[in-house]
């Protein structure tokens, strides 16, 4: 199996992306196709010993930066690493694609060159979030669709359900709607209409609304929302986590006794940090497009890239997209 990697995508590319690819081929049977500036990639690779039959390079001289407008950049930079990686997938020269680059550009490229799974109204960007249980939850959408209809959210629920069933082996995953209150009837018109749609569809194990404070408790396996709400929720959670660790670090260093206590608790802090570490998951799929595309965090280092590549392999093997297509037949008012 071949997985294309946008080697120039992310804050630490191309060094960390390349290192992640080298780690991935040690722990899996995939071949990684590095898409990026060949000269730079060759300079990095010469310092490592690896199975040269399982690392390939496709030259891409352009890079879509994080600040660039996604749709414009995709059209203007056809020789960019993101676009070329997606094109390889379209041409079936690879089985999946991974990028830690400009999320909007990955989304735009995938829609332009791969299209949607037949019947999917809107694809969704998902992310895995750590919980108090042993299994993460998936939340979608987190930014692809800021304006949604109830039918879009119903399809997000379906795609999240199938993903958690297949990837995490959760039978009949619990599905919830992210809302401003737990009670039925809460929220705006979209939330209320979506609630009724999910509640009355027998294929869903719908448990009702969850509030933002409950996101990380593991109450639901799949959390559904529009991209506007989802993006704010995730970015807020990231900010709170970073600030909390900074405050703890500052307090631990404030006196001798707190420093000693901090040293004693260091293993516990490491366990907590590992549970919150996005690199453990690697990335999350762009669900609903006609191909396996994994989006990694922009700050991904080698470990996250390695895990994203391994996740892409797993998603391909599990035929998630085929199962989504089959699942659509169980939703009324499909439309194309």
UniProtKB/Swiss-Prot annotation:
A Pfam family per the record: FA_synthesis
EC number: 2.3.1.274
SUPFAM superfamilies: Isocitrate/Isopropylmalate dehydrogenase-like
Compartments (UniProt record): Cytoplasm
This protein's UniProt keywords: Cytoplasm, Lipid biosynthesis, Lipid metabolism, Phospholipid biosynthesis, Phospholipid metabolism, Transferase
GO annotation, cellular component aspect: cytoplasm
Entry's Gene Ontology BP terms: fatty acid biosynthetic process; phospholipid biosynthetic process
Pathway: Lipid metabolism; phospholipid metabolism
Reactions this protein catalyses: a fatty acyl-[ACP] + phosphate = an acyl phosphate + holo-[ACP]
InterPro entries: FA_synthesis, Phospholipid_synth_PlsX-like
Main location: cytoplasm
Alphabetized GO MF terms: phosphate:acyl-[acyl carrier protein] acyltransferase activity
Function statement: Catalyzes the reversible formation of acyl-phosphate (acyl-PO(4)) from acyl-[acyl-carrier-protein] (acyl-ACP). This enzyme utilizes acyl-ACP as fatty acyl donor, but not acyl-CoA.
HAMAP family from the UniProt entry: PlsX
Assembly and interaction partners: Homodimer. Probably interacts with PlsY.
Family: Belongs to the PlsX family.
NCBIfam families: plsX (TIGR00182)
Protein name, entry field: Phosphate acyltransferase
Taxonomy of the source species: Bacteria, Pseudomonadati, Dictyoglomota, Dictyoglomia, Dictyoglomales
């Amino acid at each position: 199996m071949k997985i294309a990697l946008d080697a120039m995508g992310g804050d630490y590319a191309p060094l960390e992306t390349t290192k992640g690819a080298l780690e991935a081929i040690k722990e899996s049977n995939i071949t990684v196709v590095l898409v990026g500036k060949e000269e730079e990639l060759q300079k990095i690779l010469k310092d490592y010993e690896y199975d040269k039959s399982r690392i390939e390079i496709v030259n891409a001289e352009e890079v879509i930066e994080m600040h660039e407008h996604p749709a414009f950049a995709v059209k203007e930079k056809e020789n960019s690493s993101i676009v070329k990686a997606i094109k390889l997938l379209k041409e079936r020269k690879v089985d999946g694609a991974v990028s830690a680059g400009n999320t909007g550009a990955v989304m735009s490229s995938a829609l332009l060159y791969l299209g949607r799974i037949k019947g999917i109204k809107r694809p969704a960007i998902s992310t895995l979030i750590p919980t108090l249980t042993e299994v993460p939850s998936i939340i979608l959408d987190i930014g692809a669709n800021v304006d949604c209809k109830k039918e879009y959210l119903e399809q997000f629920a379906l795609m999240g359900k199938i993903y958690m069933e297949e990837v995490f082996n959760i039978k009949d995953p619990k599905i919830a709607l992210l809302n401003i209150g737990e009670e039925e009837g809460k929220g705006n018109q979209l939330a209320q209409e979506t609630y009724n749609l999910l509640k009355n569809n027998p294929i869903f194990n719908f448990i009702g609304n969850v509030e933002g404070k409950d996101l990380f408790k593991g109450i639901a396996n799949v959390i559904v929302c529009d991209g506007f709400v989802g993006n704010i929720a995730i970015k807020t959670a990231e900010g709170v986590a970073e600030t909390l660790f900074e405050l703890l670090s500052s307090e631990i260093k404030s006196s001798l006794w707190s420093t000693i206590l901090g040293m004693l608790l260091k293993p516990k802090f490491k366990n907590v940090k590992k549970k919150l570490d996005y690199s453990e998951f690697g990335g999350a799929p762009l669900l609903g497009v006609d191909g396996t595309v994994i989006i990694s965090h922009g700050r991904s280092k080698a470990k996250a890239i390695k895990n994203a590549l391994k996740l892409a392999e797993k998603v391909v093997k599990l035929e998630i997209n085929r199962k989504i297509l089959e699942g659509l037949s169980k939703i009324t008012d499909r439309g194309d």
